[in-house]
Amino acid sequence: MRVVVIDDTWPLDRARAILEPCGVTVEFNTEIAGDDVVAVLTYPGGKIGVDVLDAAPNLKAVGTCSTGFDHLAVDGLAERGVWCCRVTHFCDVEVVDHTMALIYAVLRGVVMLDGLVREGTWWPYPRAPRPVRGSILGVVGFGAISHGLITTASAVGMDVRVASEHAAAGDVAAAGGTLVPLDDLLGAADVVAIMTSLTDRTRGLIDAAAIAKMRPDAYLVNTARAAIVDHLALGRALETGAIAGAALDVLPVEPAPADEPALTWPNTIIQPHAAWYSAESDRRSFDDAAEDVARVLRGEEPLNGMTRPAEVGPLA
């Protein structure tokens, strides 16, 4: 039996140490094919659809080294008896820290001021830096990472508003925020932070109409998924000055191609999808994904299986 790793950055020695006790061999291969393939380890750029079962009919599990899972046909694979497993909480601290860094950067004008000095300008500033304490942070989504962001932002004196269809007001309040409708959040926030998962319901959630509700001096920070925001509508808002700026850790195509329009947008900070990253979180992401696949191969319940496969049935 084989486990195929389609990400050439995956540390195979660690994957083998975790999975080979299950009686499998672990190999890097961009081709998923063979009756002996029982599991696949993938990454956000490695899409896995139901058609994989045409070439690997005995597939039991797909593990991704990411929290996001929009690259996996979760429901379709579950219907065919395949577990899809993601990793959770492996980079919560890193994403919170990076998002806070971007919030500080846009409000305090860190990148703008650096650019002025390099251009030979010292004073005056084209835009005044703003205080972080007392600013309104609007958080779109309420999960483990956004919970950490709310706690951290409220601790430094930000007024945190949260929009979520699923959150309870008491839970948001316990984290340090206030639950409000999305439209109210957009109209009030100094900074809107996108922190929700990408699903069919959230795809394009922040569209042209939503961006138009933002204050003209507001910033948008996205460390979640690019497709939650209408990319072209955001660009138009930045180019026309309808909002003050943006900080983006995610783009529609990654790595960014040379013709990526965001590269020329004014008042925009762009990051290489790095909010999740540290040496520690990198190791945890690979190990946790392999551990969950190992659980499936041992006949156990994975910790982070997203949809119970039909053929597995309910737990006893």
Model regions and ranges:
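Oxidoreductase and adenylate-handling cofactor-binding alpha/beta cores
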Residues: 96-115, 154-158, 287-300
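NAD(P)-binding Rossmann-fold cofactor-contacting core
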Residues: 155-173
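Phosphate/diphosphate ligand-binding glycine-rich loop within oxidoreductases
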Residues: 38-114, 129
